């Protein structure tokens, strides 16, 4: 048995799973994903074999460069799921991690995170009680800010996107 792959019996029992990659020195996740089979181990392999630049690969390369004993820690958070359930669990964990200031290297936030992802009570009320905009009375510019941006203090988003004139 190897620490960079699962045996066939384990793969059969895992089904779809959600995993986290940890920096062993910081003991906090830097990546959360959904997979089957040996997917959890493929990121380290990709960082070694590919020239692709990404925050995830850079983090893995940095961990590996410290010394041979520093390895990415692979943690299965939940397993034995269908793909559909695993996507929901993955999205919920990414949302929670991002809302607590974790420095995840995920390039996307997960399935349906914009529509049904993490929201406070006021945001839920606003979402489901918003009145439809039937007509525009003035010229407008619409800026779509998705949840990929880092959380900022109240008012800062408005101040940074309003017209200066």
What is each residue range found by the language model?
Residues 2-150:
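Structure-specific nucleic-acid interaction/processing domains
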Residues 155-165:
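Structured alpha/beta reader/binder surfaces that contact nucleic acids or chromatin modification marks
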């Amino acid at each position: 048995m190897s620490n960079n792959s699962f045996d066939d019996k384990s793969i059969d029992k895992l089904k779809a799973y959600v995993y986290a990659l940890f920096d062993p020195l910081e003991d906090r996740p830097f990546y959360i994903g959904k997979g089957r089979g040996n997917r959890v181990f493929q990121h380290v392999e990709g960082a070694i074999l590919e020239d692709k630049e990404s925050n995830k690969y850079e983090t893995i390369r940095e961990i590996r460069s410290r010394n041979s004993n520093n390895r990415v820690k692979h943690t299965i958070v939940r397993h034995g799921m269908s793909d559909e359930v695993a996507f929901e669990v993955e999205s919920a964990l990414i949302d929670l991690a991002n809302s607590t200031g974790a420095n995840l290297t995920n390039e996307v936030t997960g399935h349906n995170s914009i529509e049904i992802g993490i929201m406070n009570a006021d945001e839920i009320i606003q979402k489901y009680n918003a009145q439809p905009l039937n007509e525009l009375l003035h010229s407008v510019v619409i800026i779509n800010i998705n949840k990929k941006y880092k959380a900022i203090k109240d008012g800062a988003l408005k101040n940074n996107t309003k017209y200066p004139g």
